[in-house]
Every structure is written in structure tokens, then in C-alpha cells.
């Protein structure tokens, strides 16, 4: 059984037991969270697609860790004008483990 959930403005295909890095969620490590924005649930031959959400469907997950992603380097330059600008960015993330998918 798998589901498509929306969190942090992005959509993820999840199954029970998977670990997944999502946008930062303000929750403590080893705490349970409930993802209620479930867009689709499928198991075997049965597929339920929401309009836009599947009514009553939830995904329960456990927060494993918090961290920061790889550095993205930004470099701007104007040719012949001796203008150069460097910038870097590291996005915060939360790693979660999917425990249960329920309808």
C-alpha cells in the first residue's frame, strides 16, 4: 500500500517503513506526526484519488532527525563590468519514517 501526501508545498509518494526527507517540520525527535493532506491512496488493485484530498485518509509518521541539506552556491556576474556576487544557501529538512497509512 502506498499514498501520495503533500507537505511543505511538495508531493511525496510514501509507503510504510520508508524514510523520507521533507521540508522542516517543527516537531521533536521521536515524536509522532500526522500528515492529513493525502492526495491518493493505492493498495493492490484499489486506487482512491481525492478531489483534491481523500476524505478521512491520514498518514502517521515518526520524526527521525533534523538537518541541513547540501550547500547550493549562487554566483552572479556581469561581463566586462567587474561585478561578481557569491552567495550560498542550505535548506533545513526533517527526516521522517512512515509508520501507518489509514483510510
UniProtKB/Swiss-Prot annotation:
GO terms for molecular function: rRNA binding; structural constituent of ribosome. GO terms for cellular component: cytoplasm; ribonucleoprotein complex; ribosome. The keyword rRNA-binding applies. It comes from the Bacteria. Pfam families: Ribosomal_L21p. One of its GO terms (biological process) is translation. Keywords: Ribonucleoprotein, Ribosomal protein, RNA-binding, rRNA-binding. Belongs to the bacterial ribosomal protein bL21 family. This protein binds to 23S rRNA in the presence of protein L20. Part of the 50S ribosomal subunit. Contacts protein L20. HAMAP family: Ribosomal_bL21 (MF_01363). This is Large ribosomal subunit protein bL21. The gene is rplU.
